[in-house]
Amino acid sequence: MYAIVVGCGTTGIKIAEWLMASGAEITLIEKITEKQRFADNLLGSVVVLGDGTTIDTQNTAGTKRADLFIATLSSDEDNMLACQIAKHYFEVNRTIAISANPDNANLLRLLGIDIVVDVTDLITEKIQSLVAPMLVEDL
C-alpha cells in the first residue's frame, strides 16, 4: 500500500510511523521547512516540502499512485481541499481528513471524503468512557 500523509505535526508523524511499521510505503507532505527536516530525520527522507493543498505538490509526492491519502492539517478547510484534489484530480481511492470543528465534519462527509475523524467527538467519547464509571460509583 502506498499512503500519503499531509502534515508533519504530531498526528501526521504518529500516523506515518504506524503506517511504516505496518509495511506501507509512505510519503509525507509538509510546507514548513523545520517540520519537514525533523520528519525526514525521524522517518528517513520521506517528506516532500510543499503545500499539500496544491496539485503541483501532490503530483511531486506521487498522489496519482496512492491507495490512501490522509490530511492531518490544523485547518479543516485545508484538509478538505487536499482530500478533494487527491480524490477528484488524482483519483485516490481512499481519503481521510481530520476535522477539528464538529460543525464541519458532516460537510466533509458530504463532499465525498471517505473517512472524517472528528477530533472533538473522539475526545468527548474518551472522557465520557473514563468518567462514566466514576459516576456509577457515586450512586
Protein language model features and the residues they cover:
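Cytosolic regulatory regions of ion transport systems
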Residues: 1-139
